[in-house]
C-alpha cells in the first residue's frame, strides 16, 4: 500500500564532508526495537500501556531514553519542568537551537505509539547524524516533554504558558503536578527557568502518529500538518422540574433530559451542516435525580468544539446556544452555558510545511496536508517559534487504546522524513 523508495535528493544542505546528506537514512531496525523496548514500562495485562506522567513507569522509561540520548552523543539534562533535553552542538552555537521531540507518557491503558514514535524517532535522527559525522549549523536539541497527556505541562512551561496555580492540580497518579515534577528530577520552585522566549528557539519539529484514520484509509504515507485545532469546552446545564413519572400528565412535564437529548441532536446537526472540518461533541451527560420513577429536573452535559479557526468555534457555539435556548423554551425548561476550557489553535509555519512535504517526496513518499484534531506539544511551541509536524498513519485510526498501532515501515519512513526535515530546516532563513 505504501511506497518505500528511499531516493536521494536533498540539495544545498550544510553537512560534514564525511557523509552526504542524500545518503543518510535512519536505522529502522534499531528505531523499532527501541519502541518495542519501551513497552516494558507500564505494560497492562490487556496488552496496553499505562505509563502515565509522574509514575514509576514514566520515570524508568525516561531513564532508558536518556541512555539512548547519551549514546547518540547528546549532552543530557533535566530542566525545571522535568523536560528531558539532549543538546548537540552546532557549527555556530551562537545561533538559537533547532528543537524536535515529543513525549513518553501515555494515557491510562493506552498504546505505545502516541508520543513514543516522535521521541524515539528524534533520538534516532541525532544518532544517525552522529554516526555519519554530519554537522549542522544550528545546535540541535531533542526534547522529551513532561506530562503531555494531562495538560502539556512541560511544553507549556517552555512556552511560558503554565499558570502557577496549575502546579497544585492532581495528576493521573496520587501526586500533584508539583510533586510529579520533583519526582522526575525537575524543580517546580524554579519553573520559570524552563521558559524559552521568542527568538530563543530557531524552530520546532514533531513527528507523531496521526491518531486518526485519514492516512491509513487513503493509503497516504505522510501527513503534513496544516495546524493543530483549537478546543473550547462548556458545561451546559438544563433546568426543568423534577416530578412524579407516573402522575404528571404529558402536557405538564418539564423534562430536562428530553431537552438535553434534543440538544445533543441539534449539536450534531449544526456541526454537520456547517461547511468545514469542525467537530462538536457532547461527551458527558448526568441526569438528576437519576431515579427511574422521577422526571429529570436537572441535566448537566458537556459541549466541546474543535476547529483550526477560533472565530469559527465562537460562531458555531453561538449558533448552538441560540438553538438550545429555543429547544429549552419549547419544553418549558431553561439552559445555561459556562466555558471552562480553551486551548487556542496553532498553525504550522508555511515554510516548514513545504520542507516536510519536499522531504517526504524526495523519499518517494505520498503526502497529504491535513489538520491535527488532537492537541500536541507542538501547539505550545508554536507560541515561541516556527512549528512543523509530521504525521504517520495510525492503523484503522485507533489511538489512546491498547489496539493503537503504526506499521514499522511507517515509523521508519516518518523518522527519515524528520531527518531530512531537520537538515533542510537547519539551512533555512526563518527570520
Language-model regions: role of each:
Residues 31, 39-44, 101-102, 367-417, ...:
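Zn-dependent metallopeptidase/amidohydrolase metal-coordination segment
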Residues 100, 109-148, 234-238, 250-270, ...:
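Alpha-helical metal-binding/catalytic segments enriched in His/Glu/Asp
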Residues 79, 135-136, 191-195, 247, ...:
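Flexible, glycine/charged-enriched surface loops at secondary-structure junctions
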Residues 28-36, 41, 48-111:
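Acidic/His- and Gly-rich active-site-bordering loop/insert found
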Residues 25, 40-44, 174-226, 264-269, ...:
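Active-site-adjacent substrate-binding region
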Residues 5-21:
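N-terminal export signals
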Amino acid at each position: 500500500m505504501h511506497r518505500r523508495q528511499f531516493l536521494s535528493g536533498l540539495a544545498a544542505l550544510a553537512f560534514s564532508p564525511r557523509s552526504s546528506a542524500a545518503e543518510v537514512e535512519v536505522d529502522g531496525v534499531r528505531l523499532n526495537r527501541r519502541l518495542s523496548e519501551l513497552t516494558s514500562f507500564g505494560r497492562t495485562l490487556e496488552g496496553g500501556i499505562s505509563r502515565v506522567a509522574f509514575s514509576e513507569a514514566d520515570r524508568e522509561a525516561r531513564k532508558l531514553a536518556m541512555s539512548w540520548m547519551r549514546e547518540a552523543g547528546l549532552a543530557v539534562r533535566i530542566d525545571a519542568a522535568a523536560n528531558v533535553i539532549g543538546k548537540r552542538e552546532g557549527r555556530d552555537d551562537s545561533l538559537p537551537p533547532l528543537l524536535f521531540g515529543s513525549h513518553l507518557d501515555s494515557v491510562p491503558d493506552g498504546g505505545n505509539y502516541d508520543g513514543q514514535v516522535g521521541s524515539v524517532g528524534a533520538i534516532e535522527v541525532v544518532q544517525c547524524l552522529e554516526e555519519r559525522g554530519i554537522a549542522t549549523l544550528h545546535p540541535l536539541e531533542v526534547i522529551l516533554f513532561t506530562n503531555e497527556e494531562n495538560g502539556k505541562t512541560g511544553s507549556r512551561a517552555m512556552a511560558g504558558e503554565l499558570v502557577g496555580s496549575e502546579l497544585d492540580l492532581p495528576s493521573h497518579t496520587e501526586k500533584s503536578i508539583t510533586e510529579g515534577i520533583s519526582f522526575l528530577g525537575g524543580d517546580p520552585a524554579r519553573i520559570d527557568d524552563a521558559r524559552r522566549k521568542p527568538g530563543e528557539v530557531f524552530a520546532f519539529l514533531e513527528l507523531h502518529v496521526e491518531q486518526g484514520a485519514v492516512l491509513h484509509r487513503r493509503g497516504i504515507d505522510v501527513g503534513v500538518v496544516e495546524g493543530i485545532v483549537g478546543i473550547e469546552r462548556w458545561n451546559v446545564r438544563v433546568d426543568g422540574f423534577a416530578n412524579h413519572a407516573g402522575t404528571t400528565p404529558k402536557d405538564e412535564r418539564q423534562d430536562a433530559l428530553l431537552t438535553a437529548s434534543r440538544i445533543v441532536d441539534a449539536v450534531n446537526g449544526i456541526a454537520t451542516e456547517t461547511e468545514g472540518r469542525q467537530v462538536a461533541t457532547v461527551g458527558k451527560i448526568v441526569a438528576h435525580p437519576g431515579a427511574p420513577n422521577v422526571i429529570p429536573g436537572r441535566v448537566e452535559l458537556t459541549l466541546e468544539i474543535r476547529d483550526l479557526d477560533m472565530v469559527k468555534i465562537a460562531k458555531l457555539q453561538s449558533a448552538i446556544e441560540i438553538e438550545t435556548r429555543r429547544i429549552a423554551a419549547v419544553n418549558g425548561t431553561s439552559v445555561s452555558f459556562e466555558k471552562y476550557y480553551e486551548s487556542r489553535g496553532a498553525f504550522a509555519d508555511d515554510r516548514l510545511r513545504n520542507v516536510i512535504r519536499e522531504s517526504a517526496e524526495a523519499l518517494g513518499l505520498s503526502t497529504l496536508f491535513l489538520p491535527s484534531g488532537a492537541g500536541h506539544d507542538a501547539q505550545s511551541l508554536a507560541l515561541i517559534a516556527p512549528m512543523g509536524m509530521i504525521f504517520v498513519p495510525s492503523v484503522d485510526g485507533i489511538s489512546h487504546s491498547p489496539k493503537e498501532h503504526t506499521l514499522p515501515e511507517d515509523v521508519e519512513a516518518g523518522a527519515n522524513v524528520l531527518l531530512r526535515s531537520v537538515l533542510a530546516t537547519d539551512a533555512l532563513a526563518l527570520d
